[in-house]
Swiss-Prot record:
GO terms for cellular component: HslUV protease complex. Its main location: cytoplasm. The lineage of its organism: Bacteria, Pseudomonadati, Pseudomonadota, Alphaproteobacteria, Hyphomicrobiales. A double ring-shaped homohexamer of HslV is capped on each side by a ring-shaped HslU homohexamer. The assembly of the HslU/HslV complex is dependent on binding of ATP. Belongs to the ClpX chaperone family. HslU subfamily. SMART domains: AAA (SM00382), ClpB_D2-small (SM01086). Keywords: ATP-binding, Chaperone, Cytoplasm, Nucleotide-binding, Stress response. GO terms for molecular function: ATP binding; ATP hydrolysis activity; peptidase activity; proteasome-activating activity. The gene is hslU. This is ATP-dependent protease ATPase subunit HslU.
Length: 435
């Protein structure tokens, strides 16, 4: 996992997310504490539990974006899920233990990818041997093989088509739930898993270019060199010690006192989450996984419900509270220009492919930020997401006629923005439907 300092994590998040210093600091400290715990002696390490986080803030201010960027930074098994996808055990839908099963699958893929790099050289030699077998036959003389090996390494045979035997992953086999099992405790049973184990690995012949065959064959040869048992144990260990789960939309599973009916299994989802966050053992097809040291970061807009509407026990298991601020006009302006892949940079690059140059002036950017902020305050505050709608409206004409404007420069200034949006943003009734 990553050994970045909290300051480095915050500065990395600053490249993509505007403001929200408190939230960035909280996740940076939590991530660094994962690393600190690994440095402790064994006896103390088991006692140090992660301090789970609850992020509260209106929609479109960066809660989900923080989780996405954190996933890339963490170099640890990371899963982002919406709490609304899950139902109480006994109802149709996914039960919360599926979160841990999915996390194990992610950890397995990460561990396998890392281990493959260690055996890549050996796997490449074995893959080259299989390509030569396909080109000249297994019984060809050594001189012939050497001659073709040289051509192969020089790239002369890259486009030649060959037939190779590869393992059949059985992706076309159906999956099904086990009837009568609440929440499908066994998860999805894959028929090909059962058949593969019963009849040994099946293979199929695939026809492909030499260049394309290397990726498939190197991956296959790498897997033969790996100890699958050890790989699985390492993945489970990684989940137990470094796993991070980001639970989005947690406010949507609050059962509000004044509203009855329709919320039949919402509080049940919270009850099911309790043992998972507190620490329990979840059975997966790869083995048992303890959740004591998995870090949970929950987030929600809490527009209608309040954090106090969560079950008291669940509130207690999310001790660190971070409030994210609504975006001001100045923040909107920064969102348009500062992030590494800001909206303006994206649109400039997109239209550049048609040889059209977009030139955004300062007053043009101000006008876009101003209109987005005023619509947010009069209609519904959806944060930075409003900028997508406004930008699409402003650039609608240019985007449509871009193919006829090759070689031209289009200046987006305040007058241009007001011409395309002015009346719309002033008319509240219209902007409710259009912006």
């Amino acid at each position: 996992m990553t050994s970045f300092s909290p300051r480095e994590i915050v500065s990395e998040l600053d490249r993509y997310i505007v403001g929200q210093r408190d939230a960035k600091r909280a996740v940076a400290i939590a991530l660094r504490n994962r690393w600190r715990r690994q440095q402790l002696p064994d006896a103390l390490r088991d006692e140090v539990l992660p301090k789970n986080i609850l992020m509260i803030g209106p929609t479109g201010v960066g809660k989900t974006e923080i989780s996405r960027r954190l996933a890339k930074l963490a170099e640890a098994p990371f899963l982002k899920v919406e709490a609304t996808k899950f139902t109480e055990v006994g109802y149709v839908g996914r039960d919360v233990e599926q979160i841990i099963r999915d996390l194990v699958e992610i950890a397995l893929a990460m561990t396998r990818e890392r281990k493959r790099k260690d055996v890549q050289a050996k796997a490449h030699v074995a893959a080259e041997g299989r390509v030569l077998d396909a080109l000249v036959g297994a019984n060809a003389s050594e001189a012939t093989r050497e001659s073709f090996r040289r051509k192969l390494r020089d790239g002369e045979l890259d486009e030649k088509e060959i037939e190779v035997e590869v393992a059949d992953s059985g992706g076309g086999m159906p999956t099904f739930d086990i009837p009568g099992m609440p929440g499908s405790q066994m998860g999805m049973i894959n028929l090909s898993d059962i058949m593969g184990k019963a009849f040994g690995g099946r293979t199929k012949t695939r026809r492909m270019a030499v260049r394309d065959s290397y990726d498939v064959l190197v991956a296959e040869e790498s897997d033969k060199l790996l100890d699958q048992e050890q790989l699985t144990q390492e993945a489970i260990r990684s989940v137990e010690n470094n796993g991070i789960v980001f639970l989005d939309e947690i406010d949507k599973i609050c059962a509000r006192a004044e509203r009855q009916g329709g919320d039949v299994s919402r509080e049940g989802v919270q009850r099911d989450l309790l043992p998972l966050i507190e620490g329990t053992t979840v059975a997966t097809k790869h083995g048992a996984v303890k959740t004591d040291h998995i870090l949970f970061i929950a987030s929600g807009a809490f527009h209608i419900a309040k954090p106090s509407d969560l079950l008291p026990e669940l509130q207690g298991r999310l001790p660190i509270r971070v409030e994210l601020q609504a975006l001001s006009k100045d923040d909107m302006r920064r969102v348009l220009t500062e992030p590494e892949a800001s909206l303006i940079k994206q649109y400039v690059a997109l239209l550049n492919t048609e040889n059209v140059t977009l030139d955004f002036t300062d007053d043009g950017i101000d006008a876009i930020a101003d209109i987005a902020t005023s619509v947010n305050s009069t209609v519904e505050n959806i944060g930075a997401r409003r900028l997508h709608t406004v930008m699409e409206r402003v650039l609608d004409e240019v985007s449509f006629a871009a193919t006829d404007k090759a070689g031209e420069t289009v200046t987006i200034d305040g007058a241009y923005v007001r011409k395309h949006l002015g009346d719309l943003s002033k008319n509240t009734d219209l902007s409710k439907f259009i912006l």
